[in-house]
């Protein structure tokens, strides 16, 4: 039986990916970069350290990166945050995990204030044992740093006793590099095949599907 679940947030617990994608796309366009919204969507889930180099040269990242990131965060908060909702059965899943003594950690490329806000949106305040944010690491997913810090907070629970739940290949790659079983959440941006190829042991259709198959979740580590 697993002893801990590490959760991604955006696109996994809350329906925020499209808002982030539109905010990043607009911020990039304001600074003269036009990768296209579809291309940006497929980079959401990475931190700015990993996202920006997909579209900018190293020199452009140095010159414009901080301003683009700041603008994207501001656009998300002013234009999209109010529309973000939790996916069905998120709180139900967290309550069941808590009842069974399974620890729950949030691992996000976002800032601490953003993760706090996400807990409010997902209605899981008081149901989270620990969180890892961009302030805790120098490299975001798909680097394993975030997962490794989460494991440190879970000690003495081992990597083999945990699973990581996320919606992107970056989540799966980060988890596998840290020795943690990766589980995917199906979504319109990445196919199940892409998630499996990235390292997910299994892909569930949604958090509600994961909750429905809860007994299988417990035996997946």
What does each model-identified segment do?
Residues 1-3, 95-98, 111-221:
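Asp-based, Mg2+/Mn2+-dependent phosphohydrolase catalytic module
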Residues 2-91, 96-102, 113:
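N-terminal helical cap/lid subdomain that shapes the substrate entry/recognition surface
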Residues 8, 12, 108, 167:
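Conserved G/P- and acidic residue-centered "switch" motifs that form tight phosphate/ATP-binding loops
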Residues 57-66, 104, 148-161:
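Short, charged helix-to-loop "capping" segments that act as catalytic/coupling loops
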Residues 86, 107, 139:
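Residue-level marker of regulatory loop/turn positions in helix-turn-helix DNA-binding domains and
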